[in-house]
Amino acid sequence: MATSLTLIATPCTAPRSSSSFALAPRLPPRCSNATAARRRAVRATTLQSDQEPAGSGDSGATTTKLSASTSVRQERWEGDLPIEGCLPPWLNGTYIRNGPGMWDVGEHAFHHLFDGYATLVRVSFRGGGGARATGAHRQIESEAYRAAVARGRPVLREFSHCPAPAKSLLHRFGDLVGLVTGAALTDNPNSAVLPLGDGRVMCLTETTKSSVLIDPDTLETVGRFRYTDRLGGMVQSAHPIVTDTEFLTLLPDLVRPGHLVVRMEAGSNERKVIGRMDCRGGPSPGWLHSFAVTEKYAVVPEMPLRYSSASLLASELAPFYAFDWVPASGSYMHVMCKSTGKTVASVEVPPFMAIHFINAYEEEGDEAAVVVDCCEHYGDPAIIETLVLSRLRLLRGKDVLPNARVGRFRIPLDGSPFGELETALDPEEHGRGMDMCSINPARLGRKYQYAYACGARRPCNFPNTLTKIDLVEKKAKSWHEEGSVPSEPFFVARPGATDEDDGVVISIVSSDDGEGYALVLDATTFEEIARVRFPYGLPYGFHGCWIPATEE
């Protein structure tokens, strides 16, 4: 049972920030002011000095000060949350964020940000008169997490963690079989959280076995999502494209280098192959964390950071973990028709490094093309090493965050062998930091104007702003608060909205003073309208989703 702490909701106080924010006219206040006594009572629940971690069986929300790269101190918590500012009356639903939240187990400390065991954070909003917010966090009980807690050390292979090699020849052979079959790879689903079209909610990362169902109300782990097809494979995209009717993803083939483009209908557990895209360079597929789609096409990226079978089978860390950086192998972008499975374009492009794609759309006419936007690191994989936990903790305030931009590919559909890669927006507009983008989902696969990202206010060693980028007017606006690390800004459209940026942006923020809160920005003005405080600090997380409240 989750440990419970009830706090006093204080629905409408002026938001506090280092910047000056005005309430957006589209989102009128409908709640009363909080008293200073209430706020002091809330803050008294957060310890102001270092203490031993609270175990999963402890009561209360006793925690130490937390920074973005420090583990959560208890397995779960649930309670009411105080509101500063005003929630819009239409904001009724639940925001869930997934990400690594536990980097320490027993005496073992993980090496890389991507290693941490998945921690879900939930904030449920009820706007309007009598506004209320409730929150919770909970560890996803994957096989990897349960085994690590039971043994006091990691058992399965994580992003940068290789379990100690077995001593006997027989056990070493067993370890090798486990790696070849994928059984020894993690099922720690610490990347994305997605509402499927049938009401189920899935969390996942890049191993196929990491697809896990959760209960969005309690955050309980329901169990592994069991695919009923025979497609197999060890890895998948961590960011499938999900709509009300389908689930579209890519399955890298490490044996015959290429990718399967597959579709799964809402309500089904069976993936069906749309088509196969062979790789053009290198001995293996490029790392494929995410991809893009248009209304007609799936876009398959092939970058020179490639899966490495040798590194996967090794018992010690390689320079790029499970990958090799092979710029001589070339960089390519492939376009497949979603209805026929036919390849309509396959072009060579300048070297690129992109973990997250933003959106894509089609341009018609005499110069028909597919345009694809991504968070691009100038063809440099240094961002991978930047996310080593020791660097994140020791280099705070140092200007070591690698440069990034909105990279825009233009893929001609006339059979040309080459595509273009340009910068879609002056990188100084967003501090030369760019990652964790979201868009209005109504613009998925279509021409669009706005995206919401984590940018940078330098000097910094990690993205530290929320930034609205305007790809038509070529400008950006940022929210920043000193000492705070925001996670992905997630766009939630106002019901019935017609303007692309009519809604709010939600981000979970970790701060150096040991606090954590959900920040709500007016997406049009990009000004703060509310923050919902947790009684303890929150670790950094990756991606979120929005589940609208059902009508009563």
Swiss-Prot record:
Keywords: Chloroplast, Dioxygenase, Iron, Metal-binding, Oxidoreductase, Plastid, Transit peptide
Biased composition (Polar residues): 59-72
GO BP field: carotene catabolic process
Domain of life: Eukaryota
Distribution of this protein across tissues and organs: Highly expressed in panicles, inflorescences and parenchyma cells of the root stele, and at lower levels in shoot apex, leaf buds and xylem parenchyma cells of the stem.
GO CC terms: chloroplast
Annotated Fe cation binding sites: H239, H289, H356, H543
Cofactor binding summary note: Binds 1 Fe(2+) ion per subunit.
Main location: plastid
Key word rRNA-binding present: no
Name listed for the protein in its UniProt record: Carotenoid cleavage dioxygenase 8 homolog A, chloroplastic
Species annotation: Oryza sativa subsp. japonica
Gene: CCD8A
